[in-house]
């Protein structure tokens, strides 16, 4: 058997027989921090504009990683359920641990839904741990950096979301005062003309009202910003086609989720019926689900939500698949700074990143959850060079904004 050290010695003598798989000793302990073990996994929920689920992974190397699962109930219990599958494992084996959790939870819904969201939060925290152990930013763990900053689009709301003029005024304000050059408004708002919203059919006056919103915003903003509009899976295929057709003259950035997310055949028909770009993806899980949108080119823009779809590496894989069809990625995001930065790290590392969503511009303390300042400036996120995600959780701020009944991480 040839030892590893002998293979590295230019003066060592050995035969080709010595190099056979049966005779080479390939044992090479990683050593040092690379032999770290996971000791604990904890969660807490923060009462933001959504109930954000923060995840902490602890190691015997003294390094703690922070992640975020997609908001809502259930994930914390699932993460607690998965903790025994992680304790004692090496946190650097991110891809193996991801598949390990999927397999372990295969009888409990690991193909999609809350289990994948919970795994996503753990996976993000593992990237934070790995970056800190290896002293590299998280983007280096998913391919390296294409850009130093990521374009951010701001999801906007007004007190009267059905008022076209109110939407136009808010769009102008955010562009002029906050510096964004990309914004989004909702179109699934009441028009006052509905007869039966349950059937998802849009009557002509309803479509006219939505066109009025689009016209008011795009004319007010002009060339200063790209403007997208979100439908939240609200309409029939026929209604979606008619609406998209009516918007073709307004050069909208994209129309998002016009039909329910389950039937990708209908989604393809809508997309191929119009020159209005169609964006879909936040309600579709893992690379397997996204593939059924990308391969038939049922979308013009893919919009996965990283803390929901499977985490950082899964989003990178989705972006690679999208790139095969020349489809850009505009990540959906309603997260705290943790999930947002995880998304930004991946957006920096993929060639086809279009923009990243920001959904908390009206929440004054969003940035207080971390010690770093000025995360978003003039509609862009600069990617930090610090190890891991590059953010430090402010535990005092987390405690101040926890969901009632939650407890803070036990850092002892």
From Swiss-Prot:
One of its GO terms (biological process) is amino acid catabolic process. The keyword Glycosyltransferase does not apply. CDD domains: MR_like. Disruption phenotype: Impairs growth on D-xylose as sole energy and carbon substrate. GO terms for molecular function: xylonate dehydratase activity. Homooctamer. This is D-xylonate dehydratase.
């Amino acid at each position: 058997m040839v030892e590893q050290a002998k293979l590295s010695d230019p003066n060592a003598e050995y035969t080709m027989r010595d190099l056979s798989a049966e005779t080479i000793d390939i044992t090479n302990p990683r050593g040092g921090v690379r032999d770290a073990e996971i000791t604990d996994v904890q969660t807490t929920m923060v009462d933001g504009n959504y109930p954000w689920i923060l995840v902490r992974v602890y190691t015997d190397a003294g390094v703690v990683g922070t992640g975020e699962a997609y908001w809502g109930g259930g994930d914390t219990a699932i993460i607690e359920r998965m903790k025994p599958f992680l304790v004692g494992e090496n946190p650097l084996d991110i891809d193996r641990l991801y598949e390990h959790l999927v397999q372990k939870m295969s009888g409990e819904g690991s193909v999609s839904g809350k289990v994948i969201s919970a795994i996503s939060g753990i996976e993000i925290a593992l990237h934070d741990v790995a970056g800190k152990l290896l002293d590299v930013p998280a983007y280096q763990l998913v391919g390296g950096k294409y850009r130093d900053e990521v374009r951010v689009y701001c999801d906007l709301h007004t007190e009267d979301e059905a008022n076209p003029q109110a939407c136009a005024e808010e769009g102008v304000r955010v562009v002029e005062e906050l510096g964004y050059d990309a914004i989004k408004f909702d179109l699934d708002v009441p028009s006052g003309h509905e007869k039966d919203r349950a059937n998802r059919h849009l009557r002509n006056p309803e479509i006219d009202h939505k066109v009025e919103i689009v016209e008011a915003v795009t004319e007010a903003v002009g060339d200063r910003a790209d403007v997208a509009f979100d439908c939240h899976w609200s309409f029939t295929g026929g209604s979606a086609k008619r609406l998209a057709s009516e918007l073709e003259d307004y050069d909208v950035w994209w129309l998002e989720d016009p039909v329910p997310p389950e039937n990708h055949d209908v989604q393809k028909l809508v997309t191929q019926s119009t020159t209005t770009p169609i964006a879909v993806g936040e309600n579709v899980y893992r690379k397997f689900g996204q593939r059924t949108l990308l391969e038939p080119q049922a979308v013009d823009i893919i919009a996965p939500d990283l803390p929901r779809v499977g985490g950082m590496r899964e989003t990178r894989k989705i972006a690679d698949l999208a790139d095969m069809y020349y489809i850009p990625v505009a990540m959906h995001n309603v997260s705290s700074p943790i999930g947002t930065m995880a998304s930004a790290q991946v957006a920096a590392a993929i060639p086809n990143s279009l923009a990243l969503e920001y959904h908390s511009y009206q929440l004054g303390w969003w940035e207080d959850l971390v010690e770093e300042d000025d995360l978003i400036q003039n509609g862009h996120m600069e990617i930090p060079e610090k190890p891991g995600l590059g953010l430090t959780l402010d535990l005092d701020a987390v405690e101040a904004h926890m969901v009632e009944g939650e407890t803070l991480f036990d850092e002892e």
